[in-house]
């Protein structure tokens, strides 16, 4: 799995003594060699025994297992990350399936809620509104100079938990951990950022330990100007950056994406990443059953930016399979808390309006004005049901059984995060459909045993998509993230499905294979970027070489001392 980094050229390091031990990207702890301990003034600062990284990882894993709950395990892993990043990623790589739910969803949600209470050490940048005139200076203060990927949030819509203020920083930190662990992007290239624009969470404002700006959220023109000041400063500091918008509220997420997607290399993971992994899963599910997505009808519970983003990708795939735009949109039903979205409902957002059903199309449904999800199941007869509502338990037994009455093999994706917000549990879905439902979830669930059969539950996790996209963008030197690049990522993921390959098991690949999956997605993304003129054309073998050259591995390099 790991190559010998001692065969690579040494790194020339200007730090020594305690300063070196306190630099997470460079610290080796007990693995510093005798020569390095002498050359870098480390003698006497470390125990005598010199260890390998694997020995360190084994000790760290034993310590990890000694903690009794996932929150304590999360804090422990973050402490390792803040003291020795190479060891952190070696440990995470060795136990990715076990540790992913601890370092990211669902545990990261609780970590965001408790951010100010569990705060240990600074990581990333906190850009606060009162400091809006000094953003350029703050970017210069970043501990990492050659930044290639930024994940930024304003903390307003953290998972399904709402406004967490600067506690939302846990999400960029977690996401970038996955860029490295799953996509091989060096941690030296990754910078988490939170835009502190205040919070409307009264509990945080009243908390004496809350570390953010104690002020109601700014909005409107003030907010737009502040975000733009940040974007322009980033472009000046790192003009070739890949910037990922993360967990912005619905009223800001799509407008920000539309404003900046043609100005710099950026994407919104909640809208586009979620859409890409969901579409890849749906393509795989349809292929496994010998059908096309364009032959299916799809119902959504949740018509926010994430749900509508998924729906638009589904429409694009249906059109690629031969349907007209109108035909594809007629097969998609968006349901929000007021019922089915039709063209007669007032005050729709622009992205919702494009997906609303004309009332003429459903004129023969024997229903009232507010058409419920259950009525959509009965009269729309969808084959696919996707939940992005953030509200638990809304896929009721009656809803699911009504769907199953009209569809022998329903595809049901309750995608809301964290686990406490899921629309239905896989065990219930499988039981209510007598084992016929093909289920994928947003949070991790254990396999389900039903009538002597074991059902592996795929986690429709964005970590299958965004690390590969990031690796592909960096390897190709792409200047934009386009819809076609995202579509190529979805199709590449579908090709990696065990079910599509005729194998037993999950709809999505095993996390143990994530490096191979990310490399393949990266190559398809890079090739598409080149075809669209967003990257310089190079032969396939050069793309492969660039992907490998940019794929960082958690191994210690040899150090040589130099001066600043």
Swiss-Prot record:
Entry annotated with the keyword Magnesium: no
Give, as one word, the top-level EC class: oxidoreductase
Transmembrane residue ranges? none
Q: Name one Pfam family in it.
A: Malic_M
Binding residues annotated for NAD(+), in chain numbering: 157, 270, 417
- Show which residues form the site (Important for activity): 270
Naming one, the record's GO cellular component terms include:
cytosol
- PROSITE patterns per the record? MALIC_ENZYMES
The UniProt catalytic activity note for this protein reads: (S)-malate + NAD(+) = pyruvate + CO2 + NADH; oxaloacetate + H(+) = pyruvate + CO2
BP-aspect Gene Ontology terms: malate metabolic process
> SUPFAM superfamilies, alphabetically?
Aminoacid dehydrogenase-like, N-terminal domain (SSF53223), NAD(P)-binding Rossmann-fold domains (SSF51735)
- The residues annotated as the active site are 104, 175
Positions bound to a divalent metal cation: 246-247, 270
Q: Which GO terms describe its molecular function?
A: malate dehydrogenase (decarboxylating) (NAD+) activity; metal ion binding; NAD binding; oxaloacetate decarboxylase activity
KW Aminoacyl-tRNA synthetase (keyword) present: no
> What's the domain of life for this entry?
Bacteria
List the cofactors: Mg(2+); Mn(2+)
Describe how the cofactor binds.
Divalent metal cations. Prefers magnesium or manganese.
Quaternary assembly:
Homotetramer.
Please report which protein family the annotation says this sequence is part of.
Belongs to the malic enzymes family.
Q: What is this protein called?
A: NAD-dependent malic enzyme
